Regions:
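S-adenosylmethionine/decaboxylated-SAM
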Residues: 7-14, 18-248
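N-terminal, positively charged/glycine-rich alpha-helical extensions of SAM-dependent methyltransferases
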Residues: 1-5
Length: 248
């Protein structure tokens, strides 16, 4: 499915801008992950763009996980995917209080003789924005991510303090009243990325885009953390290079 065709349907559905959606779509088109996992789908807008890119690739499947509360949203992921005619590209899973329980069950299902066989090429963590939940989610997802795969975090610079200023004391099931002042003030995802992901010996190609998205690849490579903008031109250039090299 072409990007513009997907965008006509998905524009206006929270929570992804068209610019970010283009970067995500082009990443899927260029890297061609087959088995994708999304932790946190809200209304399914980003899920729709991933599914559209997988459909354009001619192969692949997305598993999207969120909380049971997402059934009550005014626009559900099921409605979003149905409007794209891409429901068959996505398996929707819901857990009561955390996608980490889903990850536990996946690790269990993939384990034989005490060894977990990884099963995903791309993991997109876009949920709680909380050190305790997403810090654990990284280590659990790592067990399921194949060598050479990519992991992406949304909300790199998001803070509970900013949400509180907007009058929101609870975010993704976490109450700010249960957090210490320094955890409220510090971007939790940034802490996860720099203290857990960027220090992990199996990861490289660290990139922070627009202080919003944070990428890493499970492969040997440069340890430097680069800060860039979400360049649509750059993603298109990568796609063109892949075509020229015969990998598109």
């Amino acid at each position: 499915m072409k990007f513009n065709d997907a965008a006509k349907v998905l524009d206006g559905i929270p929570h992804i801008s068209r610019h970010s959606a283009r970067v995500l779509y082009d990443f899927i088109r260029a890297e061609k992950p087959v088995d994708c996992l999304e932790l946190g789908f809200a209304h399914g807008a980003s899920s729709g763009y991933v599914a559209a890119a997988l459909a354009a690739n001619g192969q692949g499947h997305l598993t999207s996980v969120d909380l049971e509360a997402s059934r009550e949203f005014h626009t559900t992921i099921e409605q979003t995917l149905a409007s794209l005619n891409l429901a068959s590209m996505v398996t929707v899973c819901r857990e009561l209080n955390s996608y980490n329980w889903f990850l536990k069950k996946q690790i269990e299902a993939q384990t034989t003789d005490d060894v977990c066989a990884p099963c995903y090429d791309f993991v997109f963590i876009d949920g709680s924005k909380n050190w305790t939940i997403d810090g654990l989610a990284f280590f659990l997802a790592d067990k399921l991510l194949r060598p050479g795969g990519w992991i992406l975090f949304d909300d790199y610079s998001w803070r509970y303090a900013d949400a509180i200023e907007r009058g929101k004391t609870q975010s993704d099931g976490v109450s700010a009243r249960d957090l210490s002042p320094d955890q409220i003030d510090e971007p939790n995802v940034a802490a996860i990325f720099h203290l857990l992901v960027a220090q992990h010996p199996d990861y490289s190609r660290f990139q922070v885009q627009d202080d919003s998205w944070a990428w890493a690849r499970k492969a040997p490579g440069t340890r430097e953390v680069k800060k860039t903008g979400k360049s649509v031109l750059g993603s298109r250039l990568s796609r063109w290079k892949a075509r020229v090299s015969g990998n598109a």
